[in-house]
Amino acid sequence: MYKRQILYDETPLHKKNFIELSESGQFDSTIFHRVIENFMIQGGDINLINDEDVIDYTIPAEFNNSLFHKKGEIAAARMGDNVNPKKESSGCQFYIVQGKVYTEDELTLDINALYGGVRRLLEEEEYADTRQKFIEAQNDPQETQKLAISLSSVIEDKYGIKIRKDLSADIVSAYTSVGGVPHLDGGYTVFGRIVEGLEVIDKIAAVKTGPGDKPVEDIPMTFKVKKINKDKITKDYGYTYPE
């Protein structure tokens, strides 16, 4: 299965590291060792195939608001915040985003704020009829959410609670069309993108897995580095390099 990817200039440390590991052949024969459908496919663990810590360093986080977790993006895996508060990236492990397509409401609504406002509203006597509607819909999560969303403007005006998240038009457009994993934004460094062979992600994500979300049959990978003129990349794939 063939994929082509580009690496972002906005994340120079990750780009340099990824190219060096690819050119040296260290990524070759590594596997996708963690696969979760509608989420992501993770691989590149050089230490796993060597049974020792060949890669024992981390890379400082390189967050950029213009780079987010839409489908096909490549991001660095890392240890959790409890042991890695600076969110530094693994020296070799990465994941490719699959995710899912979101509605605009799913994407932009702060559900906790919304339902907190709904609870306050339903305590008021003037909303007794609305409270009854929620009681009647209590066994229908979709109808309950629909009712809650219909009250979002009332809650914002009445209590000054901010219900909608401030997201750029580009982010909303991406997550409501190609999809992705928005809750990872700002927590993991996105440093590249699959630009050809996007369907391969879906094929890998759909394989049978066992304990630890590891595919039952190994899915190995190999890498080749090819330098392409920046103007050609912009023309063919729509990525504009920063000045």
Regions found by a protein language model. Give the residues of each.
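Cyclophilin-like peptidyl-prolyl cis-trans isomerases
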Residues: 3-243
